[in-house]
Amino acid sequence: MTRNLVRFPVQLALAAVLLAAPALAQQPGLTLPPDGDNQLASVTQGIGLVRVTIDYNSPDVHGPTGEDRRGKIWGTPVAHYGMANLGFGTCGDQCPWRGGANENTVFTTSHDVKIQGQPLPAGSYGLLFLAGPEEWTVIFSKNHTSWGSYFYDAKEDALRVKAKPEKSAYSEWLTYEFIDRKPDRATVALQWEDLQVPFTIAVDNIADLYLDQVRRELRSSPGFNWQNWNAAAQYALQNKKNLEEALGWAEEASTSSFNGQENFATLATLADLQAANGKAEDARKTMDRAVSHPTAGPIDIHRYGRQLQAQGKNEEAMRVFELNAKKHPNVWPVHVGLARGNAALGRTKEALAEARLALAQAPDDNNRQGIQALIKELEAAGGSSQ
């Protein structure tokens, strides 16, 4: 009887411990400083609508205990060359370097991109490296959730590309820096100690991405005004993309009773897109309406005349310059247009007279110098210097 009484409390205590174990396991951990003084860091770069982010832990040249590791980083256990056996995990002697510290270094792109010219789909990837004195291999692994590179598996590679290490300014902390930026590409470099390893990230279809976004926006509140329809049409025209669709946008901007407004800007865009779609006669008629429209200012008409001159249509250009003079007499840059129009038709004396009138109206030094140069050319061509 006594033996059973002793056993019963022991059994109860053991059961209590077993029941408590899951609850203890579910307790949250503490928030403490990062291991080894490796700072958590992140960098994001926009390439048009594309967003590229690298999340990483950043070790420093002076190690956790303060020792100076300068000259002892590359090709050592700190940042080993090639594959190595890290003594832990499942990668054996085929473990790349994680390009940072602690957790996996993660490369995320919102859209498909090209790395060093090779395609990489949108998504998140473990960013790993096979370092070397002359050449590196940059690995994008589909596994971005494992700790470090301890569980690396080459079968999970999404992409491998080559990169060249370069000497660089000293960097105490391992850093990922976007060192070159263009509208459709950027170069990111891993920088640490006296070395950097750059690789390019490019977006082939920047204009297509913007046009996809524009299509969505025109179906919402941005589509409630003519300015956005006109801007969308202009963007497609400038990039020579979806010109037939853009013509529809231009028509919406200039004619729609709900969204549109007929003015010089919308008619000029419509004319440009009619021309781009092979409708030359429609474009000419539309542009005639544009320059005759009450909203057509003297600079608008002058620019159209200069555009015609650039196309070799000097007689048409002269008619436009004369229309400008009729609509906006003695206003800048009407006399400039008449000077250039007459000069293109060989009427040197008339051109010189208009140029002198334009010189008196020049609004700034740049325009004044341009007209003075034109006057000298006309005088040398046989006009009077009086």
Q: Model-derived features: where do they sit?
A:
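Bacterial N-terminal signal peptides
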Residues: P9-A21
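Extended, well-structured beta-strand/loop surface patches
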Residues: D55-A122, L128-N228
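Short coil/turn linking the two alpha-helices of tandem helical-hairpin repeats
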Residues: Q238-K241, A276-G278, G346, N366, ...
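Alpha-helical adaptor scaffolds
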Residues: Q227-E252, S257-F258, E262-V334, R340
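N-terminal secretory signal peptides that target proteins for export/translocation
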Residues: M1-F8
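A conserved position within tetratricopeptide repeats
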Residues: V214-S221, S254, F258, V291-S292, ...
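Terminal, low-structured helical/coil segments at or just beyond the last alpha-helical repeat
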Residues: P298, L352-Q386
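Boundary at the C-terminal end of the N-terminal hydrophobic targeting segment
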Residues: A23-Q26
